[in-house]
Amino acid sequence: MKPAFEDMNLQIPAVTAEPEDYTGEDGLLYCGKCRTPKEAYFPADKATLFGRDRHPAECDCQRAQRMEREAAEQQRKHRDKVEELKRRGFTDPAMREWTFANDNGRNPQMKTARFYVEHWEDMKAGNIGYLLWGSVGTGKSYLAGCIANALMEQEISVKMTNFAAVLNDLAASFEGRNEYISKLCRYPLLILDDFGMERGTEYGLEQVYNVIDSRYRSEKPLIVTTNLSLDELNNPPDTAHKRIYDRVTEMCTPVCCSGVNFRREKAQEKMERLKKLMND
């Protein structure tokens, strides 16, 4: 049977010398490119244990190459993680483009969205959400999408959906209503887009309340976008709507989105381009 130190000796790889490498005055092998050692001496006690006086060491070149490889691998893992979060978190691929980088700089509430992302840990700890309200086309969904994309880039899981999709998912779910709603509530941030546009049936309102109430009890933040005014939210038409609206206004800080109708403006731009093409 071989002594233990012989087995250890076999486990230490030999240093591969390149043509430009050289032996320094200290007897160690040096890299011919960066002029730093590719070997290091063992302490005396370790030399006896391993049966040799030196072991491989990273020269500056090798260290830089290793760090570059590790950084590239970390970037790859990050990209894969973000891609998975966006695949699971968005119900519409177009939402991927709703980012701060793509913003035209004309929405005055964009700073409010940035503030939310920059202070996410405080928002999460305080269970603070936004109620982005205003007329059609004022960029509410885009603002919410900017928040979602920015947090996903930080590898924070976000779900952005709407109640039309939620109700369809509930109807088609094989796992049961409770489990589906529990999954929604596990997301650190839930964004419900176009709130108030869902079907006003008794069943639909009941499911809307179940989702909102479950999120409320989970003590996790919620962001809601809606075309409803604060007056409509504060003066619901009936009890079924009141208990829903009360939960939302308790959980979410109102942020008024007003100004230019970006959808109408974009439609006008397309019309002008079409006219130009037809006249050319």
Locations of the language-model features?
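Residue-level preference for the first positions of well-ordered beta-strands
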Residues: 127-131, 158, 189, 221
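Walker B catalytic acidic pair
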Residues: 194-195
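Pre-Walker A (pre-P-loop) alpha-helix and adjacent loop at the N terminus of AAA/AAA+ ATPase modules
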Residues: 91, 96-130
